[in-house]
């Protein structure tokens, strides 16, 4: 399969140039509010009060393994993958589970997961490929499964700071997950994070359900 320039640059960044810097930065990032929202929806739709091993979470583009580890510690069964070899190795060591080295489209799951967590990962997929990518990942969800994704807020598409980014707006995510990928939008919201350089990064988040 021919890889795009954006994909190759992004993998070079994660595999060679900034691996350790990225890991250290993301391990410090606090996404607990969105993660807790996601967990609440997974439990509600599974009619469970607490996490258990019979609830399966897929961490799609797990990066450092930060959230995979939290899901495991809370009691979920978790599968995780990332396209970066270096991050897969680091995340496997950090989480204690084997992290699969795979792109979104190379995964081969069907009706296996109660939730998919794609925190700041789908933002590396070109806009023209997002419908196919989300539709492919959606197949991994059980009926009524929950899908979370986050993107940097905006309309930018291209190489930024050595990686490809596809930014998004609430309107676009509503169209992508709701109209194009035929999921039920449960929440669509914006939040902010403080970057290491002291600046503020705005994010858009979507939580959707497979019907």
What are these regions (language model features)?
Residues 1-108, 125-132, 136, 146-211:
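Class I (Rossmann-like) S-adenosyl-L-methionine-dependent methyltransferase catalytic domain
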Residues 120-124:
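Short catalytic micro-motifs in class I SAM-dependent methyltransferases
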Residues 114:
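Conserved acidic residues
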Residues 117:
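A conserved beta-strand element that flanks and buttresses the S-adenosyl-L-methionine
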Residues 111:
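Active-site charged/polar residues at nucleotide-handling catalytic sites that mediate phosphoryl
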């Amino acid at each position: 399969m021919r890889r795009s320039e954006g994909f190759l640059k992004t993998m070079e960044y994660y595999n060679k140039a900034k691996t350790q810097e990225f890991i250290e930065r993301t391990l410090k990032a606090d996404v607990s509010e969105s993660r807790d929202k996601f967990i609440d929806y997974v439990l509600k739709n599974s009619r469970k009060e607490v996490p258990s091993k019979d609830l399966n979470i897929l961490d799609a583009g797990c990066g450092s393994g930060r959230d995979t580890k939290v899901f495991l510690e809370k009691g979920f069964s978790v599968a995780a993958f990332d396209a970066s070899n270096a991050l897969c190795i680091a995340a496997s060591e950090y989480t204690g589970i084997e992290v699969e080295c795979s792109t979104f489209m190379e995964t081969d799951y069907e009706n296996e997961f109660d939730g998919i967590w794609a925190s700041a990962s789908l933002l590396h997929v070109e806009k023209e490929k997002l419908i196919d990518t989300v539709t492919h990942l959606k197949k991994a969800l059980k009926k009524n499964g929950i899908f979370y994704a986050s993107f940097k807020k905006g309309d930018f598409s291209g190489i930024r700071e050595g990686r490809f980014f596809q930014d998004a707006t609430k309107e676009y995510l509503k169209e992508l997950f709701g109209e194009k990928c035929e999921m039920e939008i449960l929440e669509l919201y914006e939040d902010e994070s403080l970057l290491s350089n002291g600046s503020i990064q705005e994010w858009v988040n979507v939580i959707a359900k497979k019907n």
